Swiss-Prot record:
This is 3-phosphoshikimate 1-carboxyvinyltransferase. InterPro entries: Enolpyruvate_Tfrase_dom, Enolpyruvate_Tfrase_sf, EPSP_synthase, EPSP_synthase_CS, RNA3'P_cycl/enolpyr_Trfase_a/b. Coiled coil: none annotated. Catalyzes the transfer of the enolpyruvyl moiety of phosphoenolpyruvate (PEP) to the 5-hydroxyl of shikimate-3-phosphate (S3P) to produce enolpyruvyl shikimate-3-phosphate and inorganic phosphate. Residues 1-22 are annotated as: Disordered. The gene is aroA. The active site is at 326 (proton acceptor). Phosphoenolpyruvate binds at residues 28, 101, 129, 176, 357, 400. GO terms for biological process: amino acid biosynthetic process; aromatic amino acid family biosynthetic process; chorismate biosynthetic process. It comes from Afipia carboxidovorans (strain ATCC 49405 / DSM 1227 / KCTC 32145 / OM5).
Length: 443
């Protein structure tokens, strides 16, 4: 499995003002989907700006193992020659997704609609994460699961020879569940419908339409959506421009807000409203984040200018969670530097990420002198405008914990140590050198 090497510790010290103009890596969600839909399409898909982190590269390897031709033609530039819907071949070896839950779960959906069997595996972290809520709807569509106690990796998924279209209500707001069902539904005759009570990120729906699928999205209730896909289309290769990842941009954004004197511009950041809950919350806290050059290239994007700001505590409503589920860790850092109490409500989903991120976030803050409490599934941070620091943060093989802790150390009174930064490579390989280039002191 990945990351068998020794831990790579690092210490973040008080930073000089962060200044400059940078582009963070391409969006991870879009990168995974571009590779998978490219593999399911007929003809050539051209991808520019692909995130070349370990998670996405594992998805590229998996698509090649399933029969697609996947090639890198330049930095962030890739070509995929697809096999068409239902055209996957059985791989010769297990598909190893390393640390990537997204790549693994979306690929399960694609395989579930194909008449082949494939074994899915990953690193120790991914093996510990639950898969049952992805597998439940896929089994209803005709796929069969064996091994892995039926819920965890490694497991073997045998795709349905005649996938069954269905109407499925997602048990939680999860783009991964929704996407897996839609990808399996590509091979089913008739209509496959997914109903979600709370809208989750809609990258799969947008990209399916771009590749030629017949897909319709309608409102459902107060905050939900009903997505209907007509199966057995012929998807056609497309040109995909991958915008900068807002989840990666979150780290330099928060760093710039908390380091006095900072003035930082991030270019081409995706501003899809189902991904920008963090930006909304930070602005409510008093953050100076200005958009310019707003445009659309399949996904909305803009340049963001971020200046150091005095932040105040706020309450983050639970319905915002789907639009910022990966950003609560670094939001908690911002909350620690804010004046007053920040309440982040309804964070149950953080418990089933790369680690139990709810407990890990609280631990990260506590060991650095921040007053924090967990009440049920709510995280409550009592900000005092400063963070003492001085602690060592256990990352639990989680890239976002590592980056959040390093951001905290940029502005804490004393340095913050991180026990292992190796897993940052899964999503943001150049994070450390990029931050150093902006003025961060990581040693």
């Amino acid at each position: 499995m990945s990351h068998a090497s020794r831990p790579t510790p690092l210490e973040a010290r008080g930073s000089t003002p962060l200044t400059g103009r940078v582009r963070v890596p391409g969006d991870k969600s879009i990168s995974h989907r571009a590779l998978i839909l490219g593999a399911l399409a007929v003809g050539e898909t051209k991808i520019t700006g692909l995130l070349e982190g370990e998670d996405v590269l594992n998805t590229a390897k998996a698509m090649a193992a399933l029969g697609a031709k996947v090639e890198r033609v330049g930095e962030g530039a890739w070509r995929v020659h697809g096999v068409g819907v239902g055209g996957f071949r059985a791989p010769d070896a297990p598909l190893d997704f390393g640390n990537s839950g997204t790549g693994c779960r979306l690929a399960m959906g694609a395989v579930a609609g194909s008449p082949i069997a494939a074994t899915f595996d990953g690193d120790a972290s991914l093996r510990s994460r639950p898969m049952r809520r992805i597998l439940d709807p896929l089994e209803l569509m005709g796929a069969k699961v064996s091994g892995g106690d039926g819920a965890r990796l490694p497991l073997t998924l045998e795709g349905a020879r005649d996938p069954i279209p269905m109407v499925y209500r997602t048990p939680v707001a999860s783009a991964q569940i929704k996407s897996a069902v839609l990808l399996a539904g590509l091979s089913a005759p008739g209509e496959t419908t997914v109903i979600e009570a709370e809208a989750s990120r809609d990258h799969t729906e947008r990209m399916l339409a771009q590749f030629g699928a017949d897909i319709v999205t309608e409102p459902e209730g107060t905050h939900g959506r009903r997505i209907t896909l007509t199966g057995q289309p012929e998807l056609h290769g497309a040109d995909v421009v991958v915008p900068a990842d807002p989840s990666s941009a979150a780290f330099p954004i928060v760093a710039a807000l908390i380091v006095p004197g900072s003035d930082l511009t991030l270019t081409d950041v995706m501003t899809n409203p189902l991904r920008t809950g963090l930006f909304t919350t930070l602005r409510e806290m008093g953050a100076s984040i200005e958009e310019s050059d707003v445009r659309d290239a399949g996904e909305p994007m803009a340049n963001l200018r971020v200046r150091a700001s005095k932040l105040r505590g706020v309450t983050v409503p639970p319905e915002r969670a789907p639009a910022m589920i990966d950003e609560y860790l670094v939001l908690a850092v911002a909350a620690a530097f804010a004046e007053g109490t920040t309440r982040m409500l309804g964070l149950k989903e953080l418990r089933v990420k790369e680690s139990d991120r709810l407990e890990a976030t609280a631990d990260m803050l506590r060991v650095n002198g921040v007053k924090v409490e967990i009440v049920g599934d709510d995280l409550i941070v009592h900000g005092e405008g400063r963070v003492p620091g001085g602690g060592t943060v256990a990352t639990h093989m989680d890239h976002r914990i590592a980056m959040s802790a390093l951001v905290m150390g940029c502005a804490s009174d004393t340095p913050v140590k991180v026990d292992d930064t190796a897993f940052i490579a899964t999503s943001f390989p150049d994070f450390i050198p990029m931050m150093r280039g902006l003025g961060a002191d990581f040693v």
